[in-house]
Amino acid sequence: MLPAVLRAEAEPALDYLLKQLVDFLGAEGHALREHDTPMSYYDYLCDIDHSVGYLWAAQVFAGYQLQELRAEVRAMWNHTGMIQAPMPKNKWKEIPVAQIYPAQKELIAYLRANNVDVWIVSASLEEVVRMVASDPEYGLSIPPERVIGVNLMLKKPNGDSTVGALERREGKKGIEYYFSKERMQWKLGTYPFAPLTWYAGKVAAILEWIDPSDRPILVAGDSPNDFYMQFYAAADQDAI
């Protein structure tokens, strides 16, 4: 039984993924219901382990063109009050709107003033995080190639596929490229690309995409998801 709340134009592969997900959750003892939603599936998966749920939180965007996703991000950011997420049996879950705190902007500005390169390593979908972290509209202006998160395959209109992490390896830089009209027409798929950036995977991402030997001099985080990355910081350099 598939969730009632999904975009009609979602990636066809998402239907196949959902069927696998239903079988998996059923085997775990969940009584799936007609009015289950993408959010309730996420909760079911996180009941097993958060590492199981994080990938679904990225895959649910399959089928979106990047320009569509950017419009959704802007709408969410401009939303006032709590976001009402649909749950089974006509129930709703209230979720606070994400925000950037003044202290975060101050810290980033201070680091830049002292010639420290600032990166973001997130357990969220990389494309979503980049749309906020790199867009000057939101006040952080992190270079888009320095935003690392969960990567899903991207499909181009001509049928070719790529992934954001490979663009980083190829040396693609700047918002002129990442937010270009051509790239914004690419569509998200369902297939993930390693390393997956949660828990110990954040350290793997640092090694893979930032530096294989030098450690960060400072790591900031707000959840147990960040502990591995925080303990990886170079303590001999007075890191936090």
Give residue spans per PLM region.
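C-terminal cap/substrate-recognition subdomain and adjoining C-terminal extension
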Residues: 48, 55, 64-67, 71-240
